[in-house]
Amino acid sequence: MFTHFNRGIPSHPAMPAELRAMIAGEDVCDFHHYVRVRMREGWHKLDATWHDALISYGFPVNRDWKGHSDTVLAATPIREYPAVEDLVAWKEQLLTQLTPEQRDFRAKFFTTLTEWMMTL
């Protein structure tokens, strides 16, 4: 799915100021992926992006998921794409649709977010 990934992340005082500014600032364009699985009830969306340890920071985790419905997605879909066999190649192709500035900002955002998470 295409999303503005930073819009699904809560800003928290424990985060560095730079990360909080990026969350509130310009859109971080991303092509986020989750699993679609067929269960007895039909097709469901499964997204295991955020660990339960992020609950206290306000992240949308799936701790209470019982296995009979969609999980909470890490970001709000703006555009959905069909399932593909080679996900890595597909994502690489999608990323080429972003401007160089969008790709650079996206990379900086995910690096900054990951660096903060590694301190937790």
Which ranges hold each PLM region?
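His-Asp-centered catalytic microenvironments across diverse enzyme cores
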Residues: 4-120
